[in-house]
Amino acid sequence: MARIAGVNIPTAKRVPIALTYITGIGPASAKAICEAVNIDATRRVNELSDAEVLAIREHIDATYTVEGDLRREVQMNIKRLMDLGCYRGLRHRRNLPVRGQRTHTNARTRKGPAKAIAGKKK
């Protein structure tokens, strides 16, 4: 198993598919990485030499924010919004949808399980 950005990527899969196992790298980024380091997208990870794996690793480290650093950056952005007290920050603080979705009905994923209210029946 090749280890890139702290993630053991599967060896039997094609290189672009295997790279998507790294948080912060999607299909488009994975294809761009393969093109940047001149690796054919149809090759499998177990066919790569150590030098090619090293080239992928160095390209990702130099170009992309991935894994723990990406998670930390996202959390810091959310914390910044909450500290500012802006509308989006308030929605995060109250665990409500942030992007304008309706909440009168629906939004159960974000709000959690429905809470029973005594005397609500007609």
UniProtKB/Swiss-Prot annotation:
Keyword vocabulary terms for this entry: Ribonucleoprotein, Ribosomal protein, RNA-binding, rRNA-binding, tRNA-binding
GO biological process, one term: translation
Any GO MF annotation of the entry: tRNA binding
Residues forming coiled coils: none
Keyword hit for Ribosomal protein: yes
Cellular component terms per the entry's GO annotation: cytosol; small ribosomal subunit
Matching InterPro entries: Rbsml_uS13_C (IPR027437), Ribosomal_uS13 (IPR001892), Ribosomal_uS13-like_H2TH (IPR010979), Ribosomal_uS13_bac-type (IPR019980), Ribosomal_uS13_CS (IPR018269)
SUPFAM superfamilies xref list: S13-like H2TH domain (SSF46946)
Pfam families xref list: Ribosomal_S13 (PF00416)
Superkingdom as given in the UniProt entry: Bacteria
Segments for region (Disordered): 98-122
Family statement drawn from the similarity comment of this UniProt entry: Belongs to the universal ribosomal protein uS13 family.
Subunit structure: Part of the 30S ribosomal subunit. Forms a loose heterodimer with protein S19. Forms two bridges to the 50S subunit in the 70S ribosome.
NCBIfam families membership: uS13_bact
Described purpose of this protein according to its UniProt entry: Located at the top of the head of the 30S subunit, it contacts several helices of the 16S rRNA. In the 70S ribosome it contacts the 23S rRNA (bridge B1a) and protein L5 of the 50S subunit (bridge B1b), connecting the 2 subunits; these bridges are implicated in subunit movement. Contacts the tRNAs in the A and P-sites.
UniProt protein name: Small ribosomal subunit protein uS13
Source organism: Ruegeria sp. (strain TM1040) (Silicibacter sp.)
